[in-house]
Amino acid sequence: MLFRFDNFSIDVDVERTRKYYAESSRTLTEGCDCILCQNFRAAYESLDTEIKRFFDNLGVDILQAADMTAMHADAKRNILYYDGVCHLCGSMVDGSIEKHCDQPLRKAWHHTPQYAVNAACTVYFTTNYAMVEKSFPDPVLQMEVAIEVPWVLGGKFTDTLQW
């Protein structure tokens, strides 16, 4: 299925992507029980419907992301900013990210076309992928995700975390 964004397009085999996630036993934070991973899992249901629909339309289960890390926080809003990596079975059609920047993953954010799902979630796609499960079907397209997630584990996260 062709997805057109502001200045680039991707072609995603949504059903193969969805099938992979449905059959995978991997979970986000597999083997990790830290409070930040617990918060992401617990906060998923409170994410904006538009964000959940975006991932679902691509066939991606964000709770099975290859990586999801809290990078910084906004104490006034009780929000954590997570960066993550998800994989899709697909390819770039035009507006290739790689034409715009040859820098490593997160450094590329400032130099590449991005798509804002909404004010709380931005993504970009690349064929320069990492952390792909061996069983993931080709062709692999990596989606880098930056997402605001509320602290939902009670109280303020500043009472729990030391940044």
Describe each model-derived feature in a short phrase.
Residues 62-78:
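Short Fe-S-cluster ligation motifs
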Residues 29, 81-85, 140-142:
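A general secondary-structure signal for short beta-strands and their flanking turns/coil
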Residues 73-126:
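Short flanking/linker segments adjacent to small metal-binding domains or redox-active Cys/His motifs
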